[in-house]
């Protein structure tokens, strides 16, 4: 029995906090091979990606040109994968570039609009190229979302609070948006109005989805990624909470996504769809 070729992986955002964790995880995975690393921070240009990540040399330099690195992922026997943890401003173009090169994107960068995701889905399907957009790679968060969907069948009042580090660029988080979307799929409207509300300070009640779910965003140093889904009814409060205390907790989900995306020919949104 011949051993299958490892999956070529490009990490975009290689010098970021999540990018470093991905480099460590991919370097240790027997069925994967790090072939490229990209980061726009000039401080790390030419540095060994493994040294920057803190896992020792991997003989892959960090470059600042995504397209030239994507070419490296197309030169192997197996279709390559790009893992993207960059910035909301550039992620849409990153995904389109990867698909255009036949490299399958696994995207943890949040901030994409619904219209952008729809457009990328059409682009990926036309190219018969798999793409995974995952707001949260934590298995624990997926379990929380599933529990929230079950609870929402019995509660009419719900609000979401998401708490992240103060370097996060988008709000609310992709995870909170995804959670609200999952609750909305039941086809019910939440939080029927009992009183006419007045905000003394604009935005005090958070953002509101079309289904009337309030989402509140907290940005403070010390947090990594946390979320509460709070249900209320007469005489009771039901709270679901998930806390990420170390980014390494995302890596089993990232590695699973890398393996699964090689089998896809279209875009899938959400880790729960491949579990």
UniProtKB/Swiss-Prot annotation:
GO CC terms in record: cytosol
Q: Under which pathway is this protein filed?
A: Amino-acid biosynthesis; L-lysine biosynthesis via DAP pathway; (S)-tetrahydrodipicolinate from L-aspartate: step 4/4
- State any single GO MF term: 4-hydroxy-tetrahydrodipicolinate reductase
Indicate where this protein resides in the cell.
Cytoplasm
What Enzyme Commission number(s) does the record list for this chain?
Answer: 1.17.1.8
Q: Where does (S)-2,3,4,5-tetrahydrodipicolinate bind?
A: 165, 174-175
Cell wall biogenesis/degradation recorded as keyword: no
Query: Which chemical reaction does it catalyze?
Result: (S)-2,3,4,5-tetrahydrodipicolinate + NAD(+) + H2O = (2S,4S)-4-hydroxy-2,3,4,5-tetrahydrodipicolinate + NADH + H(+); (S)-2,3,4,5-tetrahydrodipicolinate + NADP(+) + H2O = (2S,4S)-4-hydroxy-2,3,4,5-tetrahydrodipicolinate + NADPH + H(+)
Which residues does the annotation say bind NAD(+)?
A: 13-18, 108-110, 134-137
Pfam families the UniProt entry points to:
DapB_C (PF05173), DapB_N (PF01113)
Give any single GO term for biological process.
lysine biosynthetic process via diaminopimelate
Report whether Cell inner membrane shows up as a keyword of the record. Answer: no
Task: Return the Gene3D superfamilies for the record.
Answer: Dihydrodipicolinate Reductase, domain 2, NAD(P)-binding Rossmann-like Domain
| Active-site positions on this chain | 164 (proton donor/acceptor), 168 (proton donor)
Q: Which UniProt keywords apply?
A: Amino-acid biosynthesis, Cytoplasm, Diaminopimelate biosynthesis, Lysine biosynthesis, NAD, NADP, Oxidoreductase
What family does the entry list? Answer: Belongs to the DapB family.
Q: What does this protein do?
A: Catalyzes the conversion of 4-hydroxy-tetrahydrodipicolinate (HTPA) to tetrahydrodipicolinate.
Quote the protein name from its UniProt record.
4-hydroxy-tetrahydrodipicolinate reductase
């Amino acid at each position: 029995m011949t051993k299958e070729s490892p999956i070529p992986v490009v990490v975009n955002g290689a010098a970021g906090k999540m990018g470093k964790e991905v480099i460590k995880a991919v370097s240790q995975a027997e069925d994967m091979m790090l072939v490229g690393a990209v980061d726009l921070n000039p401080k790390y240009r030419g540095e060994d990606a493994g040294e920057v990540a803190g896992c020792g040399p991997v003989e892959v330099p960090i470059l600042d040109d995504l397209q030239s690195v994507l070419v490296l992922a197309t030169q192997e026997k197996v279709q390559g994968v790009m893992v993207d943890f960059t910035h909301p401003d550039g992620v849409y173009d990153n995904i389109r570039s990867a698909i255009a090169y036949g490299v399958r994107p696994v995207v943890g960068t949040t901030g994409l609009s619904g219209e952008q995701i729809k457009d990328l889905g059409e682009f990926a399907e036309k190219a018969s190229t798999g793409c995974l957009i995952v707001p949260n790679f934590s298995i624990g968060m997926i379990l929380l979302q599933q529990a929230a969907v079950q609870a929402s069948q019995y509660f009419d009042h719900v609000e979401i609070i998401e708490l992240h580090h103060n370097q996060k660029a988008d709000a609310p988080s992709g995870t909170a948006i995804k959670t609200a979307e999952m609750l909305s799929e039941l086809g019910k409207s939440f939080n029927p109005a009992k009183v006419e509300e007045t905000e003394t300070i604009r935005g005090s009640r958070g953002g509101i989805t079309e289904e009337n779910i309030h989402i509140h965003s907290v940005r403070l140093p010390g947090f990594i990624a946390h979320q509460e889904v709070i249900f209320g009814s007469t005489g009771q409060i039901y709270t679901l909470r998930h806390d990420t205390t170390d980014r390494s907790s995302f890596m089993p989900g990232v590695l699973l996504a890398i393996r699964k995306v090689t089998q896809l020919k279209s875009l899938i949104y959400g880790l729960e769809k491949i579990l």
